[in-house]
Amino acid sequence: MAGGQERILRRRIKSVESTKKITRAMELIAATRVVKAQERAASARPYSDEITAVIVDLIRAGAAKEHPLLRDNPEARTAAFVVITSDRGMCGGYNTNVIRAAERSIAAARAKGLDFSLIVVGKKAQKHFRFQGLAVDAAFEGMTDQPIYDNAREIAAAVRSRYETGELASVELAYTRFFS
């Protein structure tokens, strides 16, 4: 092998090794973020489960019949879908699974003769649905790395007012639940 070609190959090998090191560092950072997100989700799960149980008990007892968020809107012909994805990739099949679940729910709503309203959280869902030519009624970005309560309140306000006024027949969330 000529000296010039050998030098080129050595440079390429060094470049690949450098890229491998950078990729490994990115994997470690992503793994750390996943662990932190899992810890936050796990700490909120008991609270979420208990709140859900209390609401179900209130509904069964008939104590919540008049609450505007628990009554049916039979005249409404629109189902809202809140689709929660990440702002960036590097999260395995998370975004794809959430978007597929949302698309199945949208198809089911259309089969029932309902219109749909898309509320998306994260750039990935927004880009996907706009690429598909679907109207996105509300989009929230920059919340997925470090979500806080105020972010959830902002998203809920966008949906709540429409449900309370009778514009929406239902509201569904599309997300994945982590199982270890």
Give residue spans per PLM region.
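Conserved loop-to-helix interface motifs that mediate assembly, gating, or partner/ligand docking
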Residues: 1-180
